[in-house]
Amino acid sequence: MKGKIGFEEHFAIEDTLEQSKAFAGDGGIWNDFTREILDLNDERLEHMDKSGIELALLSLNAPGLQAILNADKALEVAKKANDAMAEAIGKYPGRYEGMAALPMHDPDVAATELTRCVHQI
């Protein structure tokens, strides 16, 4: 590998997108931000190529699961995010790796989801 590694490159899914809106401010960047943070395909890869990034280490956007108070909903969203990330990693081998999103409301549930991410997806 000769390119750069982008560490902790955030992505979002529709379920976590709204949580990031406060960080975008009122400067009119929300539409571009939305398009870019949801994308794990062509546009993101094009940006990576232009920046000399060979591999991106993906992680769910902040505050992500921590902003979801209901433990069952947090697990549901974690699974959706992890599945989306795994799909992108499989679609673009060598371009993406990822850090699992884990619902820390219950350590046993988090451990089960981590095991699923490591061994099943």
Question: Which residue ranges define each predicted feature?
Answer:
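Helix-coil boundary/capping segments in enzymes
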Residues: 1-121
